[in-house]
Amino acid sequence: MCNTEQQKEKIAEWIFQAIREYYMKKCTFPNDKLHHPELAGKPMAVGGDPEARHGIVLTANYIAKRAGVKTGMALWQARQVCPEIIFVPPRMDLYLRFSRMAQEIYSEYTDQREPFGIDESWLDVTASTSIKGDGMKIAKEISSRIKYELGVTVSIGVSWNKIFAKLGSDYKKPDAITEFSKDNYKDIVWKLPVGDLLM
């Protein structure tokens, strides 16, 4: 087979990452846990001012979510369903700093990066696979580096398209890597609600 045909048949390797310790949509709890270690193991949410009784839950950790706290819920409602919840204010400067540091790591694997908010990105690592290995190998290396260098964990999805890569990052969390390949996606994805495709 000639090189041109090989290139045509090459499957793109997309990686979607999301910086997470607890369930994350906005790069918050990994960093807040680092700066509030005394709150580990307690129900937490990032939100507005609970004393003034205004604001909403921007994100909540797994402990709070198990108690019924949901993203977008008013703070007073979150307190009703989880009386022991602890609210911490958002720290955008901190989240942006972590986001920049993560992007610096990703830049060593590809220049084809598409940020999706401050805590998530699509990485097209197709051009890097001949040097650094397949998508799963690259994902494992990125996961290890983020954990070691930044002190937080990531959930990563690996697939040949962006939607399945994003779905993979949400499928298992926290600190997990999920691959949806052309061999396994029907067995897993077709059983999921269609709303899960872009959570």
Label each residue range with its predicted role.
Residues M1-M199:
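Gly/Gly-Pro- and Ser/Thr-rich, intrinsically disordered tail segments characteristic of DNA damage-repair
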